UniProtKB/Swiss-Prot annotation:
InterPro entries: Cystine-knot_cytokine (IPR029034), PD_growth_factor_CS (IPR023581), PDGF/VEGF_dom (IPR000072), PDGF/VEGF_growth_factor (IPR050507), VEGF_C (IPR027928), VEGF_C_sf (IPR036841). Coiled coil: none annotated. It comes from Canis lupus familiaris (Dog). One of its GO terms (biological process) is motor neuron migration. This is Vascular endothelial growth factor A. The gene is VEGFA.
Length: 214
């Protein structure tokens, strides 16, 4: 079984190689409008470089980043995507019409097998040069946000009173103590007069009303 899968894999690889070699040889004839050492006319250069759908080789993993358990054959596919120049730094080449195309791709799962399946890819059919609105808006937002943040920080630092962090008066029975935030001095909530009214006396260490010692 493994031998058969390997044979199929190498046969497909050979067919792909022969197909690529055939088109590589035919390409100069198909696109041979210009001869060697010939000067390409301005209008031809302008039309071919302006914003338009251009065949681009796109990595499959770029379109399907979650399919990491597979190896794809081929690893990239030819897609029509917007590209070219807009002749203005404030413009960018963006798609205005799109459609999906389905292609047969070989999926290989190492040590498990392989199969040819259908995968959908996005293609651009129409492109236009449009203002970089989103990018400019984001830049303005980030600049504006930074300024507001700095103002808030300045306001906070201007009106925030200076204070020294105080340690707790006691780990146990904190509710019996009161602390001065300026001096960090701890004092008892109970008073000596309050303890005496109950025929008790104030223990300044624990801030509790204890029985008088005899």
């Amino acid at each position: 079984m493994n031998f058969l899968l390997s044979w199929v894999h190498w046969s497909l690889a050979l067919l792909l190689y022969l197909h690529h070699a055939k088109w590589s040889q035919a390409a100069p004839m198909a696109g041979g409008e210009h001869k060697p050492h010939e000067v390409v006319k301005f209008m031809d250069v302008y039309q071919r470089s302006y914003c338009r759908p251009i065949e681009t080789l796109v990595d499959i993993f770029q379109e399907y980043p979650d399919e990491i358990e597979y190896i794809f054959k081929p690893s990239c596919v030819p897609l029509m995507r917007c590209g070219g120049c807009c002749n203005d730094e404030g413009l960018e080449c963006v798609p205005t019409e799109e459609f999906n195309i389905t292609m047969q791709i070989m999926r290989i799962k190492p040590h498990q097998g392989q199969h040819i399946g259908e995968m959908s890819f996005l293609q651009h059919s129409k492109c236009e040069c449009r203002p970089k609105k989103d990018r400019a808006r984001q830049e303005k937002k980030s600049i504006r946000g930074k300024g507001k943040g700095q103002k808030r920080k300045r306001k906070k630092s201007r009106y925030k009173p200076w204070s020294v962090p105080c340690g707790p008066c006691s780990e146990r029975r904190k509710h019996l103590f009161v602390q001065d935030p300026q001096t960090c001095k701890c004092s008892c909530k109970n008073t000596d007069s309050r303890c005496k009214a109950r025929q008790l006396e104030l223990n300044e260490r624990t801030c509790r009303c204890d029985k008088p010692r005899r």
